[in-house]
Curated annotation (Swiss-Prot):
Binds 2 Zn(2+) ions per monomer. Its cofactor is Zn(2+). A zinc finger (CR-type) spans 159-237. PANTHER family: CHAPERONE PROTEIN DNAJ 1, DNAJ HOMOLOG 1, MITOCHONDRIAL-RELATED. Residues 10-74 form the J domain. The gene is dnaJ1. It is found in: Cytoplasm. Belongs to the DnaJ family. Participates actively in the response to hyperosmotic and heat shock by preventing the aggregation of stress-denatured proteins and by disaggregating proteins, also in an autonomous, DnaK-independent fashion. Unfolded proteins bind initially to DnaJ; upon interaction with the DnaJ-bound protein, DnaK hydrolyzes its bound ATP, resulting in the formation of a stable complex. GrpE releases ADP from DnaK; ATP binding to DnaK triggers the release of the substrate protein, thus completing the reaction cycle. Keywords: Chaperone, Cytoplasm, DNA replication, Metal-binding, Repeat, Stress response, Zinc, Zinc-finger. This is Chaperone protein DnaJ 1.
């Protein structure tokens, strides 16, 4: 989104948060609204438009750099340096000169910024552009989109290819994004001769401004595409295949370049951000790149030693339990955990937990009683050294 558009928009209000809201509060507010307004969950057209606005707000406020620029821009136009005056956003980059001399607004802005805060020239560079002349305005890049994906634990750990269904502005399939009727090309603007700018003189000053005939694009579409009405964009439902990388964690945000909202008249598309939600697994857990599992064992398996068959992400592995292992001990199997982004795998951490039988009968009962007697005779005291 261009900075010049920030002046008229209150992103905090759109998300229902205060201007000093924490990143976590902004994230929670966006998720709540997105789940209700997403076109797949709410077919109302107004909900779709609102979803785009909410996504724009989150895209700016969730980025620390963009949020700072947004706050500075809003404060500047709220009545500070510019006294609350509104500026026509049709102005692009501009400069003024006369009698061979130039008046550099950036010098004024840089001096003003020395009182503290963001360089005001930088802000105006985004709002009106910098330079000695106007450049032809390019069609604006499409907005970024936000969506969510629910994954099973194993899918998140190993990675998965999955389809995502999106309803959003996309390049018009009829004109392929040009905005012109198929077979007819846009013509060069005769007012500005394709430059996109008009040079004017006022007294001692000369300045340039965007051409109002072609709106700074340098070309005019005389015969607009009937499908998109000349915008090059239509709203449609599309399905894209997304590769979720291995090792993603719950709440992680994945960027897919160029998969967002289409830009007007052939401009580049925005990006798609996918927030991953991982469903808990009844067997596996995770500690960073380590895979965790708690396995029930009998007392005799710990006391006498044994080999356990333990599940992993890729089948089972035999884990040796040393003789005399304590309940709750963690056994490590190297390289059998979650795939790492840098290559290789984390470890498998196996916690052994004794399962006590509720009822013993017959030979098992007698054998355990005999063991208890032998244990007492040996002088073994499990609470030796414990307590005060």
């Amino acid at each position: 989104m261009a900075q010049r558009e920030w002046v008229e928009k209150d992103f905090y209000k759109e998300l229902g948060v205060s201007s000093d809201a924490s990143p976590e509060e902004i994230k929670r507010a966006y998720r709540k609204l997105a789940r209700y307004l997403h076109p797949d969950a709410n077919p109302d057209n107004s909900a779709g438009e609102r979803f785009k606005v909410v996504s724009e707000a989150h895209n700016v406020l969730s980025d620390p750099v963009k949020r700072k620029e947004y706050d500075e821009t809003r404060r500047l136009f709220a009545g500070g340096w510019l006294g609350g005056r509104r500026f026509d956003s049709s102005f692009g980059d501009f400069g003024m000169g006369g009698d061979g001399a130039e008046f550099n607004l950036n010098d004024l802005f840089d001096a003003a910024s020395r009182t503290g805060g963001t360089n005001i020239g930088d802000l105006f560079g985004g709002l009106f552009g910098r330079g000695a002349s106007v450049r032809p305005s390019r069609p604006r890049r499409g907005n970024d989109l936000e969506t969510e994906a629910d994954l099973d634990f194993v899918e998140a750990a190993k990675g998965v290819a999955m389809p995502l269904r999106l309803t959003s502005p996309a390049p018009c399939t009829n004109c392929h994004g040009s905005g012109a009727r198929p077979g007819i090309s846009p013509k060069v603007c005769s007012t500005c001769n394709g430059s996109g700018v008009i040079n004017r003189n006022q007294g001692a000053f000369g300045f340039s401004e965007p051409c109002t005939e072609c709106r700074g694009s340098g070309s005019i579409i005389e015969h607009p595409c009937e499908e998109c009405k000349g915008t090059g964009v239509t709203t449609r439902t599309r399905t894209i295949n997304v590769r979720i990388p291995s090792g993603v964690e719950d709440g992680q945000r994945i960027r897919l370049a160029g998969q967002g909202e289409a830009g007007l008249r052939g401009a580049p598309s925005g990006d798609l951000y996918v927030t991953v939600h991982v469903r808990p697994d009844k067997i596996f857990g995770r500690n960073g790149d380590d895979l965790t599992v708690t396995i029930p064992v009998s007392f005799t398996e710990l006391a006498l030693g044994s080999t356990l068959s333990v599940p992993t992400l890729d089948g089972t592995v035999g884990v040796r339990v040393p003789k005399g292992t304590s309940d709750g001990r963690i056994l490590r199997v190297r390289g059998r955990g979650v795939p790492k982004r840098s290559g290789g795998h984390g470890d498998l951490l196996v916690t052994v937990k004794v399962a006590v039988p509720l009822n013993l009968e017959g030979a098992a009962q007698k054998a355990l009683e005999a063991y208890a007697a032998a244990e007492r005779s040996s002088g073994f005291n499990p609470r030796a050294g414990w307590g005060r």
